[in-house]
């Protein structure tokens, strides 16, 4: 009995000693495992061994299979407040630790299974918002990572930041390298699928241009032929899209020689055609049709016009063949110049040129598709501009002089004999110098002259009927065709896209200067008529009166409509009938057939 009591006392003392030794580590600060990775990476994979250090300094190596059988403490979450050690380790035994002489084959883990995470560490169950990250290659959208965790180790935090920065830089450099290899469509700026018809273009623009060059190109812009063509609005206006295709350099023969053939490309072409057919009835075309009134979307009875089916080379050939012959003046070198003699020479030459101008206009592609009234109207508005651009073109090879005819070459001093003629001479010489500096070609000259004819009176039609609107639409389409021919000539000459745009703008700006010269010349000629300096010939006189009729300004306080009505009652009808007479007599005299 005594032995038994002694044994119990010794056992209790030994037990208290063991408790003191084992509970000593509990007085140290609580160990927290830093989480350097998202929670999804904290749980161990069965193939990766791990090593954990415990307060006693012992190291245990185990894998996830052993960890699955390990005893887990603190099922309600890790305590983060002072005085919570007892709650963390429970009340069974000595803080939940097994005896020292019976080490468990499974190591201890201070980890939580996924269902038991604390609320503030619970990962989001939905998509994390996106944020912008500033990289050297620009602002890019990236998916936000998991929420930030408490990291007591500042070195580990800096190391993690350096790793993320290095990863971001690598991604940014890869994005920049891939961006350098990306090519965009020259028409709509979408991603290019290849080199089609001479330029880098997408599949949609390639299919659209393919359909257009096969004859389906009778498009009409519902606005001002200046629609924006980009990825989102390329289907809204087919006319402006086709124009931009030509502007960027697309051409029928612009196919790469290293292009492969075979079944793969045949299947690809079929897919392109299917996509192209889907574009015809797109919502963008329906919106464009509904936005504009029906008079602008009239049925095109002239859509089968021969002029609209000509290629660029055929258009140039037709315009060159239509050029009038060179006429000689009645100049007598033995007679000195006077105001009356010089004006007589010039007006006689202009009157004879007008007869040939009528024949030339009838051979301009698309001109004879208009009504006779509209043909006369365009000629009445543009005749002096056409004469002046021809004079400037002939004078290119004679700096400082104007070649009115092969036997009539005048300089500025000779023009002083006519009052008010020097100012007009100076403007003509300046325009000729500009043509010479630009090295204007004959093909470009005939295109510019045709543009003057068709564009001069298109906005001054006296009627606004449906027929008149149809005529205007036809004129605009022929003008677009001639403009495309100009661009084709520049591309054929080897000019870059930027040089083509610059040259086209410079040429069209010269036309406004020629219009200004024509107005000055018309005023001077009318003043000569009022002074009775020289008798004017019938056709020239009627052309002058017709131009005064179509002038937009009113005289003597009368309105424009009243002025037009008074002229129509007097000279207007006579002028039109007289000019129509020259049409009939010109055909009877055997002029060449029209286009």
From Swiss-Prot:
Q: Annotated region Disordered: where?
A: 147-174, 259-282, 553-573
Presence of the UniProt keyword Repeat in the record: no
Q: Where is the composition biased (Basic and acidic residues)?
A: 154-165
Summarizing the annotation, the consequence of altering residue 264 to I is: In a breast cancer sample; somatic mutation
The biological process GO terms on file are: androgen metabolic process; antral ovarian follicle growth; cellular response to estradiol stimulus; cellular response to estrogen stimulus; chromatin remodeling; epithelial cell development; epithelial cell proliferation involved in mammary gland duct elongation; estrogen receptor signaling pathway
Substituting residue 39 to P results in:
Impairs AF-1 transactivation
Tissues expressing the protein:
Widely expressed. Not expressed in the pituitary gland.
Report the outcome of residue 539 to A: Abolishes interaction with NCOA1, NCOA2 and NCOA3
Q: List the NR C4-type zinc finger ranges.
A: 185-205, 221-245
Mutating residue 6 to Y: what's the consequence? In a breast cancer sample; somatic mutation
Give the span(s) annotated as Mediates interaction with DNTTIP2.
185-310
Task: Cite the residue spans of the region called Hinge.
Answer: 251-310
Q: Phosphotyrosine is carried by which residues? A: 537
Residues the record marks as carrying a glycan: 10
Known consequence of changing residue 447 to A? Loss of hormone binding capacity and temperature-sensitive loss in DNA-binding
Which stretches of sequence are listed as region Self-association?
264-595
* UniProt PTM: Phosphorylated by cyclin A/CDK2 and CK1. Phosphorylation probably enhances transcriptional activity. Self-association induces phosphorylation. Dephosphorylation at Ser-118 by PPP5C inhibits its transactivation activity. Phosphorylated by LMTK3 in vitro. Glycosylated; contains N-acetylglucosamine, probably O-linked.
What is the disease in the record? Estrogen resistance: A disorder characterized by partial or complete resistance to estrogens, in the presence of elevated estrogen serum levels. Clinical features include absence of the pubertal growth spurt, delayed bone maturation, unfused epiphyses, reduced bone mineral density, osteoporosis, continued growth into adulthood and very tall adult stature. Glucose intolerance, hyperinsulinemia and lipid abnormalities may also be present.
The function of this protein is: Nuclear hormone receptor. The steroid hormones and their receptors are involved in the regulation of eukaryotic gene expression and affect cellular proliferation and differentiation in target tissues. Ligand-dependent nuclear transactivation involves either direct homodimer binding to a palindromic estrogen response element (ERE) sequence or association with other DNA-binding transcription factors, such as AP-1/c-Jun, c-Fos, ATF-2, Sp1 and Sp3, to mediate ERE-independent signaling.
Stated name of the protein: Estrogen receptor
Q: Which gene specifies this protein's sequence?
A: ESR1
């Amino acid at each position: 009995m005594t032995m038994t009591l002694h044994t119990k006392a010794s056992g209790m003392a030994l037990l208290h000693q063991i408790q003191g030794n084992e509970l000593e580590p509990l007085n140290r600060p609580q160990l927290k495992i830093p989480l350097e990775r998202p929670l999804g990476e904290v749980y161990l994979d069965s193939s990766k061994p791990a090593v954990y250090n415990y307060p006693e300094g012992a190291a245990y190596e185990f894998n996830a299979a052993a960890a699955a059988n390990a005893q887990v403490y603190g099922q309600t979450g890790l305590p983060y407040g002072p005085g919570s050690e007892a709650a963390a380790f429970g009340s069974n035994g000595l803080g939940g630790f097994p005896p020292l002489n019976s080490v468990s084959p499974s190591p201890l883990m201070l980890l939580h299974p996924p269902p038991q995470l604390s609320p503030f560490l619970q990962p989001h169950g939905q998509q994390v918002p996106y944020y912008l990250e500033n990289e050297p290659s620009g602002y890019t959208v990236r998916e936000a990572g998991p929420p930030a965790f408490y990291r007591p180790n500042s070195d580990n935090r800096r190391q993690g930041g350096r790793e993320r920065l290095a990863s971001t830089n690598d991604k940014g450099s890869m994005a920049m390298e891939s961006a350098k290899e990306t090519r965009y469509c020259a028409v709509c700026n979408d991603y290019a699928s290849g080199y089609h018809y001479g330029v880098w273009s997408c599949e949609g623009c390639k299919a659209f241009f393919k359909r257009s060059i096969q004859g389906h190109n009778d498009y009409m812009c519902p606005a001002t032929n200046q629609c924006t063509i980009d990825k989102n609005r390329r289907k809204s206006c087919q006319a402006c899209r086709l124009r931009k295709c030509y502007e960027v350099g697309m051409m029928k023969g612009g196919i790469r020689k290293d292009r492969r053939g075979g079944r793969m490309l045949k299947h690809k072409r079929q897919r392109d055609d299917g996509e192209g057919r889907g574009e015809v009835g797109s919502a963008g075309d329906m919106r464009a049709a509904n936005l504009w009134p029906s008079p602008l979307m009239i049925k095109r009875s002239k859509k089968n016009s021969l002029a609209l089916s000509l290629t660029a080379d055929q258009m140039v050939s037709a315009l060159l063949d239509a050029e009038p012959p060179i006429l000689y003046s009645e100049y007598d070198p033995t007679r000195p110049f006077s105001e009356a003699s010089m004006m007589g020479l010039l007006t006689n030459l202009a009157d004879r040129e007008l007869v040939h101008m009528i024949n030339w206009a009838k051979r301009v592609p698309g001109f004879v598709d208009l009504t006779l009234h509209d043909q006369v109207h365009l000629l009445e508005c543009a005749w002096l501009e056409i004469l002046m651009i021809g004079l400037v073109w002939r004078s290119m090879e004679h700096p400082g002089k104007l070649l009115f005819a092969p036997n009539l070459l005048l300089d500025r001093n000779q023009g002083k004999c006519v009052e008010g003629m020097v100012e007009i001479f100076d403007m003509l010489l300046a325009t000729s110098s500009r043509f010479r500096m630009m090295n204007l070609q004959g093909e470009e000259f005939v295109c510019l002259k045709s543009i003057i004819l068709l564009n001069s009176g298109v906005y001054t039609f006296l009627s606004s009927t449906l027929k008149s609107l149809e005529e205007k639409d036809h004129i605009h389409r022929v003008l677009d065709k001639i403009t495309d021919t100009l661009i084709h000539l520049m591309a054929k000459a080897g000019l870059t896209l930027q040089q083509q745009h610059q040259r086209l703008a410079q040429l069209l700006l010269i036309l406004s200067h020629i219009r200004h010269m024509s107005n000055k010349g018309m005023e001077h000629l009318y003043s000569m008529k009022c002074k009775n300096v020289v008798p004017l010939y019938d056709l020239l006189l009627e052309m002058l009166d017709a131009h005064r009729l179509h002038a937009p300004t009113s005289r003597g306080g009368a309105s424009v409509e009243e002025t037009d009505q008074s002229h129509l009652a007097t000279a207007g009808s006579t002028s039109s009938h007289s000019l129509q007479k020259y049409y009939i007599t010109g055909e009877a005299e055997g002029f060449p057939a029209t286009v």
